């Protein structure tokens, strides 16, 4: 694996982490709020 390929893959991983984790947190918070509203 070349250095540029490794950098590309690591940037993809970090982009996924930056996008997926906040999205997952937001979904959890929204679902919890929905349950509260339904009660």
UniProtKB/Swiss-Prot annotation:
Q: How does it sit in the membrane?
A: Single-pass membrane protein
**Record keywords: Transmembrane included?**
yes
Pfam families from the entry?
Answer: PsbX
Instruction: Give the residue spans that cross the bilayer.
Output: 10-30
Q: Which Gene3D superfamilies match?
A: Single helix bin
Q: Name one GO cellular component term.
A: photosystem II
Keyword Transmembrane assigned to the entry: answer is: yes
Q: Which GO terms describe its biological process?
A: photosynthesis
User: Which family, according to the similarity comment?
Assistant: Belongs to the PsbX family. Type 1 subfamily.
What subunit structure does UniProt give?
PSII is composed of 1 copy each of membrane proteins PsbA, PsbB, PsbC, PsbD, PsbE, PsbF, PsbH, PsbI, PsbJ, PsbK, PsbL, PsbM, PsbT, PsbX, PsbY, Psb30/Ycf12, peripheral proteins PsbO, CyanoQ (PsbQ), PsbU, PsbV and a large number of cofactors. It forms dimeric complexes.
- Tell me the function of this protein: Involved in the binding and/or turnover of quinones at the Q(B) site of photosystem II (PSII). PSII is a light-driven water plastoquinone oxidoreductase, using light energy to abstract electrons from H(2)O, generating a proton gradient subsequently used for ATP formation.
Protein name as catalogued: Photosystem II reaction center protein X
Gene name per UniProt: psbX
């Amino acid at each position: 694996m070349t250095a540029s390929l490794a950098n590309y893959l690591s940037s993809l991983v970090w982009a996924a982490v930056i996008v997926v984790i906040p999205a997952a947190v937001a979904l959890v918070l929204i679902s919890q709020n929905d349950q509260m509203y339904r009660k």
